[in-house]
């Protein structure tokens, strides 16, 4: 397996404010799979993603990505792990306002010795004609495309997406999902997508469902629907 999570536990606070968010999560994802993580609010979806991404320190358990165990890594080692392996896409874009689209993407291009081709990536994401614009000149969907390009330019092995369409309308959400599907097919990028949208589970290879900090469903999707045909986005 490319990603393996074993008995992962994570809590916050102490004494009366103590809450255990992840209570022993076990799951795995194959290389090149698109995987959706779903569950009710407070079930631990984003916390799981953050632990896998090294953004949050787990209490105990094991997370292995491409054979590398990340539990117990020192801060400098975690930084190297994120730089060498991961790309992040969040609900809000955090683009640098005084940099153009191309310049925003280039910020992350310098983090690797093996970046994707900039012009090819811009074309794939439909940003070629917008590459010299500033974020304030872009629509919400175009800004999210820029954020996706910025995450992808360093050719990550694993793309972590936390509500990537949460702030977008239905049409734009579908367009972004079509792009993620296209990127997965073209580059073979393994993806974990946290979302509240129930329809997205129909387009991915694997579905993980959390409830109260535990995995209650974990299955591979045998009847995938193309993102362009998804309803109720």
What residue spans do the PLM features occupy?
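Conserved beta-strand-loop-alpha-helix hinge in the C-terminal portion
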Residues: 214-233
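ABC family nucleotide-binding domain
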Residues: 2-3, 8-203, 209-210, 215
């Amino acid at each position: 397996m490319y990603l393996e999570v074993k008995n992962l536990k994570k809590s916050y606070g102490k004494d009366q404010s103590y809450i255990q968010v992840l209570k022993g999560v076990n799951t795995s994802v194959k290389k090149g799979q698109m995987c959706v993580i779903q569950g009710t609010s407070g079930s631990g979806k984003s916390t799981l993603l953050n632990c896998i991404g090294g953004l949050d320190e787990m209490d105990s358990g094991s997370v292995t990505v491409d054979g590398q165990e990340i539990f117990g890594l020192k801060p400098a080692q975690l930084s190297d792990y994120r730089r060498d392996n991961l790309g992040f896409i969040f609900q809000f874009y955090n683009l640098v306002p005084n940099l153009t689209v191309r310049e925003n993407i280039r910020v992350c291009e310098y983090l690797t010795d093996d970046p994707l081709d900039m012009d090819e990536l811009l074309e794939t994401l439909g940003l070629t004609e917008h590459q010299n614009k500033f974020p304030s000149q872009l629509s919400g969907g175009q800004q999210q495309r820029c954020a996706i390009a910025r995450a992808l330019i360093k050719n990550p092995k694993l793309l972590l997406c936390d509500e990537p369409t949460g702030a977008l309308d239905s049409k734009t959400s579908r367009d972004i999902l079509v792009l993620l599907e296209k990127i997965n097919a073209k580059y073979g990028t393994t993806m974990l997508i946290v979302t509240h949208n129930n329809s997205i589970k129909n387009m991915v290879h694997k579905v993980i469902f959390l409830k109260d900090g535990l995995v209650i469903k974990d299955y591979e999707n045998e009847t995938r629907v193309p993102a362009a045909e998804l309803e109720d986005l």
